Design a protein with these regions (language model features):
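Metallocofactor- and cofactor-centric catalytic cores in central/energy metabolism, strongly enriched
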Residues: 65-72, 77, 82-89
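Terminal amphipathic alpha-helical/low-complexity segments used for targeting or macromolecular assembly
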Residues: 1-62, 249-549
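Surface-exposed loop/turn motifs in large extracellular/passenger domains
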Residues: 55-58, 62, 75, 92, ...
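Glycine/serine-rich phosphate-binding loop and adjoining beta1-alpha1 elements at the start
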Residues: 38-41, 57, 67, 72, ...
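Glycine-rich hexapeptide-repeat left-handed beta-helix
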Residues: 1-44, 89-90, 99-134, 138-326
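Short linear interaction motifs
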Residues: 62-63, 218
């Protein structure tokens, strides 16, 4: 037996063609390449050969049980390798799999669980009647309450309860809690599924052949529905039923709302949502992985070259729509979606605010803590440390990296110079560690393009001008978030409080349960953020304003 290693999970396309060979060392980024880069057949063949080599190397005629393992009231365990300190209690059936438990991150498998052809990584809990067939479960995942999944991959910190998954690629922090939720043939990450969220990959023609992508941070509301194929942009919110196959990948931070069977797009509006900021803060805190060997390299940044490049594209798409259809049009058409005039103008404004914020952040970070004597010193400091980072960036299910570096790794796999799973993971680790170095190279080029600056002529005054714009953007955005949070304390939010009492009692009941707006921890954090960022900008301006030459 190979104990689950080498099992093919037919992710994304239920009928096959995007199979991922699961193994003990599978990372979200490896799986991303195996599933999506089918336009490079030599690469796929090499990666399959590397995975097969690993599977055969670890094959054995006998299973194994590690040290300090507890197995209690369990039905059948056949062809399974069980790691140290694992707890298996009341489990029905485990067949052909690996449980990669260890002392720092033990695995718990609980009552009524049935797993066939599976791998469960360190620190995970699979409990309460969960059923898995041909599945990979990453580190610190939690599956329970009768969750059922087939041909699916769950990477770090995913949670699945009550519902159902079929052929999904669940990148880090994909969360689904509700009985009525079906995730099928989709790629997700940093995603929260509302109750009754469904997708269809079948149009009753040639079978379940369709697939879709919700980019990082996308969320669905209750009873949302998407007919694949479709692609939803990063950090977007999907509300209602969407059947027209829109691709909003270049319009991130949007709302997709259905009105009378039509998809209406509100671009960029999620940038000012208090929920988006709260999500970005909570993910790093909810990383439950323990131990030194982490399989996935996760970048939590809300604004990165990946999302900002899309905002640049989104801004030009919206400006082109405005130019072609005329400024006075009430409704603009983008692919199969409609955009209202006010939404389009706001979208351009939101994207520009975010671009100012990101580029300003990058400059302030780059010039931090140095007392400059001349403009030439500033120019030298601004010059990037490496040429890597220009061009397009990709989000490989959690890892944000320049496409040039990904291509370099893929070329290495194709020509045979990279031929082990650990070497592939080491390349991802290197990209992750160098993220900020590469990010600055990208930002430096965009600063020149966006602000129309010549790198040999940048002066302290140019920097001061950018920092002032940055300050306006940051404070403006924070004020929008503050106002958005205030809505949660409005009179309509108090509906149902103060049962059987007067208006005053309603307010008192609300304050006892929810607290008051000004002392809310999130609200005070936003106000402190405004204060801190203003001080940060002022400090840089003060440090360089006297430079004249």
């Amino acid at each position: 037996s190979t104990f689950g290693n080498g099992v093919e999970a037919t992710v994304l396309n239920e009928t096959g063609g995007r199979e991922v060979l699961i193994n003990d060392k599978l990372s979200a980024h490896q799986a991303y390449i195996l599933a999506l880069y089918r336009h490079r057949p030599e690469l796929i063949n090499r990666m399959k050969a590397i995975a097969d080599y690993y599977s055969n190397k670890h094959a054995s005629a006998t299973g194994s049980i590690g040290d300090h393992v507890m197995i209690l009231n369990t039905g059948s365990i056949k062809n399974v390798r069980i790691g140290d300190y694992c707890h298996i209690c009341g489990t029905c059936r485990l067949s052909n799999g690996s449980v990669n438990s260890n002392v720092t991150a033990p695995v718990h498998i609980g009552h009524g669980v049935i797993c066939d052809d599976f791998i469960i990584s360190s620190g995970s809990e699979v409990d309460d009647g969960t059923m898995l067939t041909r599945c990979f479960v990453g580190q610190a995942c939690k599956l329970g309450h009768n969750y059922s999944a087939s041909d699916s991959l769950f990477f770090s910190n995913c949670q699945g309860e009550n519902g159902e998954a079929c052929a999904i690629f669940a990148g880090p922090f994909t969360v689904t809690h509700h009985k009525s939720t079906l995730l099928i043939a989709g790629m997700f990450s940093f995603m929260n599924a509302g109750s009754g969220s469904n997708q269809s990959n079948h149009m009753y023609k040639l079978g379940p052949i369709h697939q879709g992508t919700m980019e990082r941070g996308a969320k669905t509301t209750s009873d949302s529905y998407i007919l694949w194929p479709a692609r939803v942009g990063a950090f977007s919110l999907v509300m209602g039923r969407h059947v027209n196959h829109a691709d909003t990948s270049n319009l991130p931070f949007s709302y997709l709302i259905e009105q009378r069977n039509t998809t209406y797009l509100v671009p960029g509006v999620n940038l000012r949502s208090v929920g988006t900021i709260r999500d970005a803060q909570k993910w790093p805190k909810r990383d439950k992985r323990k131990g030194p060997n982490r399989l996935d390299y996760i970048n939590y940044n809300l604004l990165s070259p990946y999302t900002i490049q899309k905002m640049f594209k989104g801004r030009s798409i919206l400006k082109d729509l405005k130019r072609v259809s005329g400024e006075t049009s009430e409704i603009y058409s983008f692919q199969s979606a409609k955009i209202k005039n006010s939404s389009l103008n706001n979208g351009i404004r939101f994207y520009e605010i975010a671009i100012h914020k990101f580029l300003g952040n990058s400059i302030i970070k780059r010039l931090e803590g140095i007392n400059f004597q001349s403009n030439e010193e500033i120019r030298q400091r601004l010059k990037p440390d490496t040429e890597i980072g220009t061009g397009e960036w990709v989000d490989m299910s959690g890892l944000i990296a320049p496409k040039s570096e990904i291509d370099r790794l893929l070329d290495g796999i194709e020509n045979g110079s990279v031929n082990r799973l650990k070497s592939i993971n080491a390349s991802f680790a290197e990209m992750h560690e160098n993220y900020y170095t590469y990010e600055w190279t990208w930002a430096y080029n965009k600063i020149q393009e966006f602000y129309g600056l010549n790198p040999d002529e940048i002066t302290a005054q140019d920097i001061i001008c950018i920092v002032k714009t940055w300050k306006e953007a940051v404070v403006g955005l924070d004020k929008m978030v503050y106002d958005d949070a205030r809505k949660e304390f409005s009179l309509s939010s108090m509906t149902g409080f103060g049962a059987d009492g007067s208006h005053d009692e309603m307010k008192q009941d609300f304050e006892q349960v929810r607290g008051d707006f000004e002392s809310n921890t999130f609200v005070t954090a936003v106000l402190k953020h405004i204060e801190d960022k203003t001080a940060l900008g002022n400090e840089l301006i003060k440090r360089i304003e006297s430079i004249q030459d």
